[in-house]
Amino acid sequence: MARTVPLERIRNIGIAAHIDAGKTTTTERILFYSGVVHKIGEVHEGTAVTDWMAQERERGITITAAAISTDWLGHHINIIDTPGHVDFTIEVERSMRVLDGVIAVFCSVGGVQPQSETVWRQAERYQVPRIAFVNKMDRTGANFFRVCQQIGDRLRANAVPVQIPIGSEAEFEGIVDLVRMKAYLYKNDLGTDIQEVPIPDSVKDKTEEYRLRLVESVAEADDALMEKYLEGEELTADELVAGLRRGTIAGTMVPVLCGSAFKNKGVQLLLDAVVDYLPSPLEVPAIEGHLPDGEVATRPAEDKAPLSALAFKVMADPFGRLTFVRVYSGVLEKGSYVLNSTKEKKERISRLIILKADDRIEVDQLNAGDLGAVLGLKDTLTGDTLCDDQEPIILESLFVPQPVISVAVEPKTKQDMDKLSKALQSLSEEDPTFRVSVDPETNQTVIAGMGELHLEILVDRMLREFKVEANVGAPQVAYRETIRKAVQAEGKFIRQSGGKGQYGHVVIEVEPTEPGTGFEFVSKIVGGVIPKEYIAPSEQGMKEACASGVLAGYPVIDLKATLVDGSFHDVDSSEMAFKIAGSMAIREAVGQADPVLLEPVMKVEIEVPDDFMGNVIGDLNARRGHIEGQETEQGIAKVAASVPLAEMFGYATDIRSKTQGRGIFSMEFSHYAEVPRNVAEAIVAKSRGYA
């Protein structure tokens, strides 16, 4: 089957923003105006097409990145609607990895919020071009120009308004297009009766001011246009669009649009901007990967090139296991066999699907640049590469943050034990930030994730989708241990008791390293003091010993172990003996190296009415928080703080009661920090069963 849409007419875009900025509503309107759905779905009514999980429809938040296709002006647009809640950051992360462009949605009242900054950083990491949509222009307190200023100041982006609103709040009635110098008024509630009118006198001055800024921004980036501009010639609309497109794709400009998705204003112009300014797969750098010999190679976005595709999401579905993929090069064909180069396993492509709203459309192939889903893959997980087995390549995987909170779960009945393990396996395959382990001491199943809401929703899904009722323990913090000074230590394992003995002996130097480096190992063995085949087992023993620290049994991180000396026995030495010796040496070294306990510290942002600010700051101080900034705007106080996760359990309930239900907060993992001595003593005592 030949390609139906040329590559230059494909757009792979995401819609991302802070929670409640109106992403899902914007997506719904895009689907309505582009003809995919014939009735508008509403988030608050629980009928949004992209919010298809029961919990999403109940809570009015988007949890999983739903992928949907639509068409506009002869272009094929694949859209991913991402969640705005920080507990679901992995969903944003994995969608950024496979997108070519993003619509960043901002609330015209709230402006740049904490999660907006997180999403922006993720887009920066993958160098994804962005356009901004200032939504909710009909809300009381809406201020388009203030939000443009914040995008420049807080996100350090070159925000270039390409539209300005006509009126705001209840008076918001239309939009001026600064590129084509046309004004549009919306005459009906559905947003389908749009009249082109002369630019109203009320916005003439603003129009001229922002048109001049737009022209100067575009001219500055292009010598030929600058020359034309300086000679006093007008730049044409086509020249402005081409200049904005170049700037957006290069990441030097962010075109800013406005509207109200809920009131059906500005969405068609937003779709025009997706086509005008965001890149096709041909206009972004070719995907890079590693060949089997470690060499870096690129794969061009062409159907004729060897196949390379990235699995960016796995989902349990009533019809089977759905694996969402982005095809970067070549063609993925139904019925073919491909290589999962990450796992080195062959997979059969039994069925291929693209999603249009709730409909699954079966297709025979996915071409370069396409997003779609494969049914029935057995071994492929998030971040794996699918490729041609004759031309193997491994694409860069996803950045997966470490979980920061864990709870113990157990089924309410013994009969549910099997169902629980199947449910947990299925959920952990879908979500790389969700980890399952068994506590070796209590034999309890422990689940770990990115926050309380994350785990709450996963437990809820176990009940709804897998019919497993579970008892859930109190949340536990993922503490870590590290060292503060460099020491030398040795580990000697000798066992002589008839028959073949055991002998392993290592001398190591251990030193602290930069935060976030984990465990590093270096061998400085020379002259065969320890045979080469015993060095890897020594390292393995050290690594395994670091899984349980000397203070309270938490993993030891951020240290470097250097193997400097040792000895061996011709007959009695073995890999196992050196593994045990390595383990003994690291435990001895960590014990001497001034070990300390580390705890996860969260970046917390809180918004409360001004009257409650004193209470909130006092409460944060009591929670060992460090206030990093505060500002007041229109009677709303915004507080930024760093607070240990251990002090934040149940905060959602506490802040509601302290602010009469009017306070909101968001938090995300920031860094690990040393636990104060008095708190650490209590944690250590509890871990040893003294408390």
From Swiss-Prot:
Q: Name one GO cellular component term.
A: cytoplasm
Chief localisation class: cytoplasm
Identify the keywords attached in UniProt to this record, alphabetized.
Answer: Cytoplasm, Elongation factor, GTP-binding, Nucleotide-binding, Protein biosynthesis
Instruction: Provide any one GO MF term from the record.
Output: GTPase activity
Amino-acid positions noted as binding GTP in the UniProt annotation, renumbered to this chain: 17-24, 81-85, 135-138
UniProt-listed GO biological process terms: ribosome disassembly
Subcellular location per UniProt equals: Cytoplasm
Where in this chain does the record put each tr-type G domain? Answer: 8-282
SUPFAM superfamilies associated with the record: EF-G C-terminal domain-like, P-loop containing nucleoside triphosphate hydrolases, Ribosomal protein S5 domain 2-like, Translation proteins
Q: Write out the similarity annotation.
A: Belongs to the TRAFAC class translation factor GTPase superfamily. Classic translation factor GTPase family. EF-G/EF-2 subfamily.
Q: What does this protein do?
A: Catalyzes the GTP-dependent ribosomal translocation step during translation elongation. During this step, the ribosome changes from the pre-translocational (PRE) to the post-translocational (POST) state as the newly formed A-site-bound peptidyl-tRNA and P-site-bound deacylated tRNA move to the P and E sites, respectively. Catalyzes the coordinated movement of the two tRNA molecules, the mRNA and conformational changes in the ribosome.
Record protein name field = Elongation factor G 2
